């Protein structure tokens, strides 16, 4: 949805046509963080000397975001901005800034709209808290 709006914004805005790539990391088992970030698949684009925007769905402790920032610094990017749809502000344990935050949320497990639990419930078209499994 974000890419669609950026590429086809309302008439008062100029459209942007960013190059998009995806990096996959894993740090959860079920509803609990493992404390370790594992790189599942890396980007294919050459981002050296370029401005990069890292978009995170949710920031819990911030360890994954810290890992990704360090990872992208190795590529010698010109600049790195971070965006997060959801931030569990009370759980963030690392000292880095997130330039753009959609919503601060409580310490609940959230699914839907791309967020999953064990690779399930990702396709729900809205966000939802899970209080019990």
Can you name each region flagged by the protein language model?
Residues 1-133:
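PRPP-associated nucleotide enzymes
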